[in-house]
């Protein structure tokens, strides 16, 4: 079936027998896809957890409106996203390389687009095992467009997280420490010479900042304890709200209508590393405007104008905006340009509430968020527990916990 497609940016969704489903960020080569998201009750995000018997839907908008057919494929990975040594039939039941057929045209918008939706599992594809997966999309010539990572959880252990200020005097004002407790009915079955256990931690849905631990600090029959896992606190996210697309607010000082809506943000000034100021955010996530009944197809797009004044010019470094809205993707699609000591950029955003940060990339390709770091900053941490018997060919996901650092102990 032909569908007009070109802008693809993905979202994936799932369920499975006794399994939860966990989603992460994705990789994109197409510049023509916007608003790819998993929609939960609270946020649109690149990361979600779904209990058994629930379906999840991936949604994305194509603004290019060219006719083409698109397909999705599934792959399985280990705990650090290296491809598993498995056949397709080991981890999926049904067909791989399925055509995406569910789409709708935008209605009553200045920016025309098609909204595509994929609900998984479906009649063509179901999942056999837990662990890390990706779903990738390609065109009918086999050209790769984008992929999204996700994980399926078969829960066998409960996880608890506690937050503390750093004990290291050097990092006392800038870092957060996590103590993680894994509760299992018989931890002896998960550890020892006959199997491997891996604990993975990420902050604010960024796989690039993952910490992987192979051994607990303390071991008991029904409990594993991991102590003093250290993260930079960072700072709260910048935000804007273009839900009411032709209105101004605290962050948008001007709007204008040309071929489509333009929204101008107040200048962002780089924060210096002195005093923490509380600024409520949603930890990098975003929320598409839901005051409209058919919000997937009736929300419009506006071009949002950014300006950022750094403390000093970054010489050869390139500056980008990142957040869950683009899966922290580094691409020219969200790059700012330097002019008279200020970085400028303008990018399309669907009506909604957005969190974002500025980051720099140096000549070596090293990624750094442009922000001070405070121990008080509220972040969202995700802990994943993977298990592999020596006789198995894959890592299963047996524990999951997502928690905000809103209560940090001294």
Model-identified regions with their sequence ranges:
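Aromatic-rich carbohydrate-binding modules that target alpha-glucans
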Residues: 91-116, 207-214, 303-351, 361-388
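Contiguous beta-strand segments within globular domains
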Residues: 34-76, 171-184, 294-306
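Basic K/R-rich, polyanion-interacting modules in nucleoproteins and related proteins
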Residues: 264-315, 395-410
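Bacterial Sec-dependent N-terminal signal peptides
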Residues: 1-26
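Short, compositionally biased P/S/T/A/G/V-rich stretches that sit at domain boundaries
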Residues: 25-51, 156-169, 281-293
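Ligand-binding face of N-terminal immunoglobulin V-set domains in extracellular IgSF glycoproteins
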Residues: 112-125, 130-137
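Short acidic/polar inter-strand loop motif in beta-rich domains
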Residues: 81, 125, 139-145, 244-250, ...
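Low-complexity, Pro/Ser/Thr- and charge-rich linker/hinge segments at domain boundaries
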Residues: 28, 152-175, 375-399
